[in-house]
Regions:
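Active-site beta-loop-alpha junctions enriched in small/polar residues
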Residues: 48, 76-78, 103, 141-143, ...
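A short acidic, helix-capping loop that chelates divalent metal ions and anchors anionic groups
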Residues: 105-111, 169, 195
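His/Asp/Glu-enriched short active-site or ligand-binding loop at hydrolase and phosphoryl-transfer sites
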Residues: 144, 150-186, 221-233
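Bacterial N-terminal signal peptides that target proteins for export
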Residues: 1-12
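Bacterial N-terminal signal peptides
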Residues: 11-21
Length: 237
C-alpha cells in the first residue's frame, strides 16, 4: 500500500486553460498523523473486499474488544453489504470508530470528480440510511488521491485520513517479527498506523498484541481512536 497523490501535467495544463482552477489540497486537509506532542497512537484498520476468505479477522476484533483497545475502522461499501452482522457489531463498541473507504475500493485518480463523488458517497449513505451512523472520516483506497478526491471529501464534510506508519501487514513475505521491527522504527507520538482487519494481514493479530503489550507501553503511548488523536492535547508535565 502506498500513498499516491496524482496530478498529470498535461491534464492540469488543459484544465487551467478551460475552466477556473480548483484550489489545490493543503497539508491541513490531508491528515497523516496527530499532533506530535500527543502521547497517543491511532490504530486504524481497513475493511475492504477480499477475493478469498471470510473478509473479517474475528480473532483480532475479539482481542481489541477484550483488551478495550480503541481502534478506527475504514469500511468500503462493498465490504459492508457482505458483512452486515459485523458492521452492526463494530458500531456497538463504544471505543471503536467507523469511517469509510470508498464503495468498491476503486483507484480514485483514474475517475472524474463526479465519479469520485459517487464512489466516496456510497458507503456514507449506506452507514446513514441502514445503520443510522453519520460518517465523518474517509480514507481513499490504496492511499491514492488527487485534488478532486480531496475537494469532494471536503465538500461532503469528511476528514481526509491517511497514515504515516505503514505496517505492511498484507505483504505475504513479511513475518510478524519484521512487521514489529518496522513499527519499532516508525511509531512515535501522534502516529497513525494502517493495518487490515479483513484477514489480508496474516500476522495482524499477533502484531497488535505486541503493540499493546510491549511497544506502546514501553514508549508511554496510548492507543486512541482517530478522532481522539486529532483532538489530543499534550499530556501535563
Amino acid at each position: 500500500m502506498r500513498l499516491r497523490h496524482s496530478s498529470g501535467i498535461l491534464g492540469l495544463a488543459l484544465t487551467m486553460l478551460l475552466v477556473p482552477a480548483m484550489p489545490s489540497f493543503t497539508h491541513a486537509q490531508v491528515i497523516k498523523s496527530g499532533p506530535p506532542s500527543c502521547p497517543g497512537v491511532a490504530l486504524t484498520f481497513d475493511l475492504c473486499p477480499v477475493r478469498t476468505g471470510v473478509g473479517y479477522d474475528q480473532a483480532l476484533i475479539d482481542y481489541l474488544i477484550e483488551q478495550k483497545i480503541p481502534a478506527t475502522f475504514f469500511m468500503s461499501g462493498n465490504w459492508m453489504t457482505r458483512h452486515d452482522e459485523q458492521v452492526r457489531a463494530l458500531l456497538q463498541i463504544p471505543f471503536f470508530e467507523v469511517g469509510t473507504h470508498g464503495e468498491v475500493h476503486a483507484h480514485l485518480p483514474l475517475h472524474s470528480a463526479d465519479e469520485q463523488k459517487q464512489e466516496i458517497l456510497g458507503p456514507v449513505r449506506l452507514l446513514k440510511t441502514k445503520y443510522g451512523h453519520d460518517a465523518t472520516l474517509f480514507r481513499p483506497p490504496y492511499g491514492e488521491f488527487n485534488d478532486d478526491t480531496v475537494n469532494v471529501a471536503r465538500a461532503l464534510g469528511l476528514q481526509f485520513i491517511l497514515w504515516n506508519v505503514e505496517s505492511g501487514d498484507p505483504d505475504p513475505t513479511l513475518t510478524a517479527i519484521r512487521i514489529e521491527d518496522r513499527l519499532k522504527q516508525l511509531v512515535r507520538k501522534g502516529s497513525v498506523i494502517v493495518m487490515h482487519a479483513n484477514g489480508k494481514g496474516r500476522h495482524t493479530h499477533e502484531v497488535v498484541q505486541d503493540l499493546h503489550q510491549h511497544l506502546l507501553p514501553e514508549r508511554n503511548l496510548t492507543p486512541m481512536t482517530m478522532s481522539d488523536l486529532l483532538t489530543c492535547a499534550q499530556a501535563a508535565p
